[in-house]
Amino acid sequence: MKTPRRFPLIALTVAAVLTAAALYWWYSHSTASTVQNRQGTEQQRASNSQGSAKRAGNAPPVQAAEALRQNVPQYLSGLGTVTAANTVTLRSRVDGDLVALHFNEGQEVAAGQLLAEIDPRPYEVALMQAEGQLAKDRATLTNARRDLARYEKLAQTQLVSAQELDTQRARVSETLGTIKADEGSVASARLNLTYSRVTAPIAGRVGLKQVDVGNYVSSGDANGIVVIAQTHPIDLVFSLPESDIASVLSAQKNGKLPVEAWDRNNKNLLTRGTLLSMDNQIDSTTGTVKLKARFDNQDDRLFPNQFVNARLKIGTLEDAIVIPAAALQMGNESHFVWVINGDSTVSKKIVASGLQGSGQVVISAGLQAGEKVVTDGIDRLTDGAQTEIVPAQASTPLPASGASS
C-alpha cells in the first residue's frame, strides 16, 4: 500500500534535476558565445584602427602647387608719405579788417577764386588821392608847356633872357618827373585796392580757417587766412636703400617708371602713378635716397601726410620659375623645397631663390616648371616618404609649415 505513493515523488525529483541541468547548459553556452562575439568585435576594431594608423603614417596628407613659368614684374618697395603737389598759406597782402570769407572749410577751390575780402575803403580813398594828385600835376605840366612856348617866342626877340628860358624848360621836365611819380602812386593804390580781394593762387582743397571775420589781418600774420593744398595731382615721397640707386637710374633710361601706392598694411592697392624725380643726395644718417612719385588722384584715394607703401616697378623678369612662398624652406645652409615625385613620394631639393613678393617667390636654380612642391603639411615629411595630396578647400587644418633640415 505504501509503494504507489513513492513513485510520483521520485519522478518529480528526477524531472526537476533534468530541467535544472538543461537550463544550466543553455545559459553557459549562450554567455560564452556573447563573450566570444564581443572579443571578435573588439579585435576587429583594433585591427581596423591599427590599419588606419599605419596607412596615415605611411601617407600623410599634404597640399601642393605646381611650379609655373611666367613673367614676373620686378619691384622696389619703400615706405612713404603723401604730400600735396603744392601747398600755399593764403595771406593778405594789405592790412585791414577781414569783412568776408567766401569758402567753406574743406572745399575744393579754383585758381583765381575769391576767398576773402579786406575792408576796401581805406584803399579806395588812397586811390582817389593819388588820382587827384596826378590830375593836378598834369594840369601844371600843361601850363608849364604853354609858358615854355611863349618864352621860346620871346627869346627870339630877346625879350626874355636865356636863363629864364632854361628855367622854364627845367620846370617842364620837373613836372614830367612829378607826373611819373604820380602815375606810380596811382598804380600802387590801385594794386592795394585789388589786394583787398584775396583770391586763391592755386587750385586745391582749403583746410580749416585760421582767422574769423571781423579780425584785423596783416601781411605779416604767420598763420595766414587758410592753407590750400593741391591734391590733383598729388605726390608721394618715399625712400629706397642706396644700393637700389643704380637699378633705378638704369630703369629710367627706358622711360617713365610706374609706381603703385598700397595702404600701410600693404594689402590694398590704392592707386597707380609714375616716378617724378629722385633726390640728388643720399641721407647719410639712414643710407637711403628720397624719390617722388606723382598720382592723378582723381578719386581722392590719397591724402596729404598719409603713410603708404610704395612699389616702384623697374623691369620684368621673363620666363621665371615661380612657386608659392610657403613652399620655400630654409635649412642650415641653403633653401630647399619638397618635390612630389610621380610615385607620390617626396624628395628634398636644394634651390636658389630670387625675387619674393605677393605670396610668390622666384626660383633661379634647382627646380623645373611643372614640378609639384609641397606647400602645407611640411612638418610631417621625410625624404622618400609617401604622401597623399589633398585640395586646400577639402582638407582639415594642417600643422604650421616649418623648415626642416
Curated annotation (Swiss-Prot):
Pfam families: HlyD_D23. Its main location: membrane. Residues 35-62 are annotated as: Disordered. Belongs to the membrane fusion protein (MFP) (TC 8.A.1) family. The keyword Metal-binding does not apply. One of its GO terms (biological process) is response to toxic substance. This is Multidrug resistance protein MdtA. The keyword GTP-binding does not apply. The gene is mdtA.
